[in-house]
């Protein structure tokens, strides 16, 4: 298994993974984005936030990324997380390791809180968030209509850093020390390998 930062060249493989969720309520998007549109999305995220891909046997099996939780400047110390895996690789610890590495990189950037939204029911994703120490914030009732029915979305929150009285602005991902990122990734990968053996 290898985890690295995503590039725009990964877009075709990432889009193929995402396509598998289009006909489900896991994403509220109803049409598959074009390859160009997906490339633009990746490009917009990697300018500021971590976007990770997980490879096994030289194939991308999943990806996870962080993005701005809300647009107003005072919200800049928050990030929302997303993770998508090929169906055969769910419930095997890959989502947990991707989320864990994302969170530790976000700490280096100065992020204070991370959030995750999960369309209900989704027991696997709920378990993932609780296992990583997220707290349930609340439920948006009947907030999305897809696949012929209304869906609730549960929101999770996790504090990942202390609240400074005068916080510094968030550091873009490209200014974070590479050695620190490698150290974070290595620690989580070793822990995952130990659990799998």
Language-model regions, residue ranges each:
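A short beta-loop-alpha structural element at the N-terminal edge
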Residues: 2-16
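C-terminal "cap" of GNAT-fold acetyltransferases
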Residues: 142-185
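Conserved small/polar residues in nucleotide/adenosyl-binding loops
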Residues: 187-194
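Conserved active-site alpha-helix within GNAT-family acetyltransferase domains
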Residues: 120-138
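Conserved acetyl-CoA-binding loop-helix of GNAT-fold acetyltransferases
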Residues: 91-104, 127, 131
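Conserved GNAT acetyl-CoA-binding A-motif
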Residues: 107-118
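Helix-loop element at the rim of GNAT/NAT acetyltransferase active sites that forms part
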Residues: 16-32
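Acetyl-CoA-dependent GNAT
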Residues: 30-88, 99-100, 159-160
């Amino acid at each position: 298994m290898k985890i690295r930062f995503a590039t725009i060249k990964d877009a075709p493989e990432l889009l193929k993974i995402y396509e598998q969720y289009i006909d489900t309520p896991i994403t509220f998007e109803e049409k598959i984005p074009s390859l160009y549109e997906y490339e633009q999305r990746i490009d917009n995220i990697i300018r500021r936030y971590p976007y990770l891909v997980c490879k096994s046997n030289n194939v991308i099996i999943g990806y996870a990324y962080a993005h701005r939780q809300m647009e107003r400047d005072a919200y800049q110390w928050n990030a929302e997380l997303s993770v998508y895996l090929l169906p055969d690789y769910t419930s095997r610890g890959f989502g947990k390791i991707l989320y864990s590495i994302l969170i530790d990189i976000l700490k280096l950037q100065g992020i204070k809180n991370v959030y995750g939204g999960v369309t209900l029911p989704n027991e696997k994703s709920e378990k993932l968030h609780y296992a990583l120490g997220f707290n349930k914030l609340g439920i948006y009732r009947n907030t999305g209509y897809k696949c012929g029915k209304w869906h609730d979305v549960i929101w999770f929150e996790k504090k990942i850093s202390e609240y400074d009285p005068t916080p510094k602005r968030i550091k873009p991902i490209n200014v974070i020390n590479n050695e620190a990122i490698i150290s974070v990734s290595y620690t989580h990968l070793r822990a995952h390998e130990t659990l799998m053996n």
